Amino acid sequence: ARGLMNQWIAYGSEWYITPILNARLMHIDDFPAPIPRGANSVIDNHYHVGTRDFYRQIWWKDMLEIGSRRKIIYSGFIIIDYNHAVRKGLMNRISDLTLKDLSLNGRELFLDEGELGVHGYNHNPLLYDSKDVDFASLNYKPWGTQEDMAAGIEQVNKYVEELFGKNVKLYTYVPPSNMLRKEGLEMLVKHYPDLKAVSSIFYGTDSGGVYIQEVGRNKEFPSIYNLPRFSSGFYYDEDEIWGIFNAFAVYGYWSHFMHPDDLISKDRSRNKSWVELKDEFEKVVVTVEEKLPFLEPMRAVDMTKRYINIEDLKITSEKKGNDIHIALTDFREPFKALIRINSKKIKNISSGSFKEIYTAGNSKIYLLSIEKEDITIHLGD
């Protein structure tokens, strides 16, 4: 309800200005990843093709088509292999077919202007054994030592360079099952030299190893930023939609994630076919578009740069007559902001640009493009 409270405060003020990231992110966890072989009953019943053919020829094609229609930029988070090798000496060479799948999907992601981030060497979260984490029920194995974790991370670095070359940098990490603790963060910072952001989840309960995040620089590991996701899945859900708008009202961005295997998981698919789910997924995107059409689609790394740009920004403002004077401290580069104005409207602005995006009674909200340290907004009736 923080978003509601934030807007309630704004509504009660003569004017209220806040910087926003103005970004729309779409994460695909477990992509690229090894594609399951053989048949799956959910897929076979509807499409009569093998699992690998379905994901290569149908699912990914549909995702690209939706992305083209809705101007989505995907950030994919790679898994090298679905094994339980959580000890340094057990990490064997992956198969040529797995290498082919990773290469094809990764290169198609790049061709679609997407970003490659890290999900893991395998899908075992970077956690030590702990009584409060039920590894057995989750079908996970705890890591033995930091040396073992480091070996897994270096496997990712090795395969990414082999598949895509030295110029591909890994800026963003998504923890498997959104589970992560200090021991894992230490290894991430040490062994991913280009890492800038960790993206887990914003809503949820911080228990059982789940990594719940607030937006901002990580206080223990200040070289990385916490930029959580606010929604997930392919299905349309009113509670998820509320969560999206509530988070936007505070932070000014939308970050959503899904997994390719959501559609063959009974709970994550809600027993719906891919034909139904792809329509519901697009409905989610359209719903957000209709309310927030100004959000800019981008890669995860690009939003991280936007956050870095405004993290130290301080805004002061005062009103004299029909002018609002805004002064910025620690201004670096142009950024977006929202301003709510009650009982007046903007006539013009001394620099940058403005666009009215919402009206309710005597209150108007504008999207500002702020380009200088000091600006004046001229109001009228």
Language model regions located:
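Non-catalytic propeptide/linker segments at domain boundaries
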Residues: 1-42, 56, 60, 91-92, ...
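Catalytic grooves of carbohydrate-active enzymes
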Residues: 8-36, 67-69, 154, 161-172, ...
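Metal-dependent polysaccharide deacetylase catalytic core of the NodB/CE4 family, i.e.
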Residues: 34-36, 68-183, 204-205, 260-264
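A solvent-exposed, charged loop/short amphipathic helix patch at secondary-structure junctions
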Residues: 34-56, 131-144, 265-290
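Alpha-helical scaffolding within the catalytic cores
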Residues: 97-107, 205-215, 233-245
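His/Asp/Glu-enriched short active-site or ligand-binding loop at hydrolase and phosphoryl-transfer sites
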Residues: 189-235
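Surface-exposed beta-strand/loop patches in extracellular or lumenal glycoproteins
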Residues: 327-347, 377
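C-terminal beta-strand-rich structural cap/linker in extracellular carbohydrate-active enzymes
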Residues: 359-381
